[in-house]
From Swiss-Prot:
Protein name in the entry: Ribosome-binding factor A
Gene3D superfamilies reported for this sequence: 3.30.300.20
Function in brief: One of several proteins that assist in the late maturation steps of the functional core of the 30S ribosomal subunit. Associates with free 30S ribosomal subunits (but not with 30S subunits that are part of 70S ribosomes or polysomes). Required for efficient processing of 16S rRNA. May interact with the 5'-terminal helix region of 16S rRNA.
Native species: Granulibacter bethesdensis (strain ATCC BAA-1260 / CGDNIH1)
Taxonomy, superkingdom: Bacteria
Database matches in SUPFAM superfamilies: Ribosome-binding factor A, RbfA (SSF89919)
Assigned GO CC terms: cytosol
Length: 138
């Protein structure tokens, strides 16, 4: 029996819960494939065909069966109204991913609005306030 306390990192010092290299590679490839499909606007949904999207990040589960796609809409911050439309075309997008990638299972796609840019803009606006600038200059 080992006398060492349980550590918060896995083999080779990799933190538990951190994505593996394979997860990162597969997620980036999915992002690339989806970006191509969105750029070509190959949708039967008229609302999606006239909207420009940016896929900021894809996170994939350890078993590579579920992928969460973080997406934003260019020209507008409102992506929530289009999430049902994206859910409707998710099967088509999954098929497009399956055509390009060699995986045992094509991952099920889940779309989430990406709020990182909004958060960064909020922090920037806070830092530009006169009272904060005054405190930072001291």
């Amino acid at each position: 029996m080992s006398s060492r306390p349980p550590s918060s990192s896995g083999p080779a010092g990799i933190p538990k819960g951190a994505p593996s290299q394979r997860q990162l590679r597969v997620a980036e490839e999915i992002r690339h494939v989806l970006a191509g499909v969105f750029a070509r606007q190959e949708f039967r949904d008229p609302e999606l065909a006239t909207t420009t999207f940016t896929i900021n990040e894809v996170r994939i589960s350890p078993d590579l069966k579920h992928a969460t796609v973080f997406i934003s809409r260019l020209g507008s911050s409102e992506i929530e109204p289009l999430l049902p439309n994206l859910k409707r075309v998710a099967t088509y997008l999954r098929g497009e991913v399956a055509k390009v990638m060699r995986l045992r299972y094509a991952p099920e796609l889940h779309f989430q609005p990406d709020s990182a840019l909004e958060y960064a803009m909020h922090v920037d606006s806070l830092l530009r306030r006169p009272e904060v600038k005054r405190d930072l200059d001291e």
